[in-house]
Amino acid sequence: MNRKTPHALLALPAGIMLALLMAVPAHAALRVFACEPEWGALTQELGGTLVDVSVATSALQDPHQIQAKPSLIARARNADLVVCTGAELEIGWLPVLLQQSGNARVQAGQPGNFAAADFVRKLDVPGQLDRAQGDVHAAGNPHIQTDPRNIALVAAALGKRLQQVDPAHAAEYARAQADFAQRWQQAIVRWTAQAAPLKGAAVVSQHKAFVYLYDWLALKEVAVLEPKPGVEPTASHLQEVLATLKAAPARMVLYSAYQDPRPSEWLSKNAAIPAVKIAFTVGGTEGAKDLFGLFDDTVARLLAAGVKP
């Protein structure tokens, strides 16, 4: 009987060998378009090698002020799942980007469109919408990623969504989500205990970016350097903040990695309080290389500035 041995297969012409290899089914990774680095990092935690994640912004960009460039439109066009913050954070660019992508899978209301803020309790929800108040979001403050408890809630919802859009690998996503949830909860307990000495501390913010962080750690925001949300600090308003702090001192002033540090540095010099750069998202500082590093770094910076030796 004439049988093909492995040696005989090796002797096949290269073109035939290539055709045989291409005929073997291969898993195509789920293509995920993440608006911000924190959601790209979370998707990677839950999806591993099952996902191919593309992130639209970096930690050094203001997520409010992104342009719907052709390169981003092309990435959205090929995506199986879009993972963004929602709560109007990307309202200035994401709707246009999705419309121009022509990708029916990722339009609002479809399983391929995931808004993280839909799954957490929003803070700073305005009683009435008045644009004279500045860049106010009707759905509430969108910077939900500064509280690790919110990350846990989003992870649970995102794990289910990954199972929905890629049911062939539902079991793998479920296992990854359960593993992440366990590790994340342990980390939250550790971070909360480490930050306990900061409870009740008075702080100043350059932008209303940290309300969820303050809610988690029981910090008290006593002033904001922006006169209105999204409006750059003015000299007169900075003087008003300085006068406020003379009557009721704060322990530190916080600004995000993507922001111009000069207003915070001015207050630091004139009020004699530390200016603390907060990563705000993955990649914002050297220590914030992933989600766990993001909160390791944030807590460490707050403690270094806010706890007297």
Tell where the protein language model's regions lie, with residue ranges:
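Bacterial N-terminal signal peptides
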Residues: 10-25
